[in-house]
């Protein structure tokens, strides 16, 4: 295991193009610091889901917003925080999917991304403070 920086911090707009650029840069950064592949993959998949949700559902089409991403390395886990100025929404309150055993045509639309985050992370948290959604998830380093 390499020596990790204390924090990676970035701000993107609610534009899908910015999301793709951010994820590419993040992948390179996680490679540079030699984060284990399984951990880096979990961070990237969860961030892709959380940021995609914020961009797709958090803003009316005409509103430009800012989404902050903070990745903090602790002793045995990584804490990822996604903070946006979009509409109030707690993605983690949705019930777990009961329809995973059904054929794709019979499943309810939505919720699979958050289901993935909940299963890859050791814990998740949402807060609403000063007109901002603060969503956090924890990824174990081992």
Residue ranges and their predicted role:
Residues 81-109:
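Glycine-rich/acidic phosphate-handling loop/turn and adjacent ATP-lid/helix
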Residues 54-59:
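Short helix-loop "hinge" at the ATP-lid/N-box region of the Bergerat-fold HATPase_c
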Residues 4-37:
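Helix-loop-beta hinge of the Bergerat
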Residues 106-121:
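Glycine-rich phosphate-binding loop
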Residues 65-72:
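A conserved short beta-strand within the histidine kinase catalytic ATPase domain
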Residues 1-11, 118-142:
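Flexible, glycine-/charge-rich segments associated with ATP-binding catalytic modules
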Residues 26-48, 106-108:
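Conserved short strand/loop->alpha-helix "switch" segment adjacent to the catalytic nucleotide/phosphoryl-transfer site
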Residues 72-80:
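Short beta-strand-loop-beta element adjacent to the nucleotide/active-site pocket used for signaling
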């Amino acid at each position: 295991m390499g020596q990790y920086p204390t924090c990676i911090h970035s701000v993107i707009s609610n534009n899908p193009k910015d999301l793709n650029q951010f994820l590419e840069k993040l992948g390179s950064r996680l490679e540079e610091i030699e984060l284990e592949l399984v951990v880096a993959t979990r961070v990237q998949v969860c961030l892709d889901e959380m940021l995609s949700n914020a961009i797709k559902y958090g803003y009316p089409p005409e509103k430009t917003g800012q989404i902050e991403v903070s990745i903090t390395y602790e002793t045995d886990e990584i804490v990822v925080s996604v903070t946006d100025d979009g509409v109030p929404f707690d993605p983690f309150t949705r019930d777990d999917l009961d329809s995973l055993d059904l054929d794709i045509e019979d499943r309810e639309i939505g919720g699979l991304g958050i289901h993935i985050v909940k299963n890859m992370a050791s814990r998740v948290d949402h807060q609403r403070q000063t007109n901002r959604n603060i969503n956090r998830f924890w990824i174990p380093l081992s």
